[in-house]
């Protein structure tokens, strides 16, 4: 019984590979099903080519023997047979790749003429091809869950502190919009680009909030500074940060947005350190509120 089970029952009902198993497990995705179909199609034509070529070779070797066929025949040892056994596999190969050519033609036509509807012949040939099924299958995006979680937690800290740098949005709304954008991307490169942008943007907002908290502390310890301000110190602080960002953009023409964001982060860190170290004697206090 064990021997019979080992010989015949080698295909697992739960689609797990077994020793000496013949054939593939049932496909769980369209991509795997396409791979299995392609395997079967290719081997069908390979067997045809193998049988045809072997028959020609064996026949040629058999008739080449001087005792079997003393008078050479042109069909066996001539140009005709060489042409036939060369052209026949070529036609088979063309027949195999024809759906791929049709798919490439459809893609080129769609790129050159996006408003042109595909013809029925192109549609029927391309829809049945394995390449179309593979290309239409969406590739999963590998998510950086660690960085996403970090961004979410940092936004919650700013929300808990009622930071004015979250554009006045309700709690959870800012992260919800970012998360929706991240989940709607269709390419891995676009996901990384968007995630890096959101991380840099949040770093800038965190730096601005930290500078504002230090600035408020300086004002609380030195009430006379508010009297020197031409208008609201907080509004003056916001205007000062915007002006410095504009100055960075003007002084660094041709720089990428990522590089400009890094320069702004460094500048905000410099402001925070100077306010902490020098307090009301800080150079930036004088620029904000006047001498």
Curated annotation (Swiss-Prot):
<comment type="similarity">
    <text>Belongs to the cytochrome c oxidase subunit 2 family.</text>
</comment>
<dbReference type="InterPro" id="IPR036257">
    <property type="entry name" value="Cyt_c_oxidase_su2_TM_sf"/>
</dbReference>
<dbReference type="GO" id="GO:0031966">
    <property type="term" value="C:mitochondrial membrane"/>
</dbReference>
<dbReference type="GO" id="GO:0022900">
    <property type="term" value="P:electron transport chain"/>
</dbReference>
<dbReference type="GO" id="GO:0004129">
    <property type="term" value="F:cytochrome-c oxidase activity"/>
</dbReference>
<keyword id="KW-0496">Mitochondrion</keyword>
<keyword id="KW-1133">Transmembrane helix</keyword>
<feature type="transmembrane region" description="Helical">
    <location>
        <begin position="86"/>
        <end position="106"/>
    </location>
</feature>
<dbReference type="InterPro" id="IPR045187">
    <property type="entry name" value="CcO_II"/>
</dbReference>
<keyword id="KW-0472">Membrane</keyword>
<protein>
    <recommendedName>
        <fullName>Uncharacterized mitochondrial protein AtMg01280</fullName>
    </recommendedName>
</protein>
<dbReference type="InterPro" id="IPR011759">
    <property type="entry name" value="Cyt_c_oxidase_su2_TM_dom"/>
</dbReference>
<feature type="transmembrane region" description="Helical">
    <location>
        <begin position="42"/>
        <end position="62"/>
    </location>
</feature>
<keyword id="KW-0812">Transmembrane</keyword>
<dbReference type="Pfam" id="PF02790">
    <property type="entry name" value="COX2_TM"/>
</dbReference>
